[in-house]
Amino acid sequence: MKIGLLKVGIGAALVFGMGTAALAQTPAASGGQVPASTNKLDSETRGFLTDAAESGHLEMAGSKMALEKSKNADVKQFAQKMIDDHAKVGQQLEALAKSKGFEPPKEPSMMQSAKLKALGLRDEGFDKAYVDEIGVDAHEDAVKLFEKASKEVKDPEVKQFAIETLPSLQQHLQAAKTLQQSVTAKSR
């Protein structure tokens, strides 16, 4: 029963939030005018910056939750590393985006926020869910995103950022997969 209500609530939040998400992407502070330097970034580059920022916020929020909820020292150590590393990358991404006249998101996407809410409701099995969803799945998505950007983004500075950040994300993914094996073995 609770899961059914959760699904309905998440579905409603996604449906009703779509319109506000679109409005949030318009530059209201400048009276609807897009700064001239933003016009230099093509939609693919802006999309990469948006997705990368949201991904980082997802991983940081999930990792902060893991620090609070997990009893597993290895999970907490991984979570702290994710917070530290993603905070640095997030600052670099924000500075780069702003230098291009683009304001990156300051929080995860609505869908990612729903995933975080569902993760936060878990007590039993939290560690496995965190490692699976934030450690492995989110990093697989991030690696794909940065690999694509490192090949296809036209802006040379944004492309370089993707190239330089990719090895760290690949290391995070490998560490998450190793942790996943350990956590899965302990949960059996």
Placement of each model-derived feature along the sequence:
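His/Met- and acidic-residue-enriched segments that coordinate or traffic transition-metal cofactors
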Residues: 2-12, 16-188
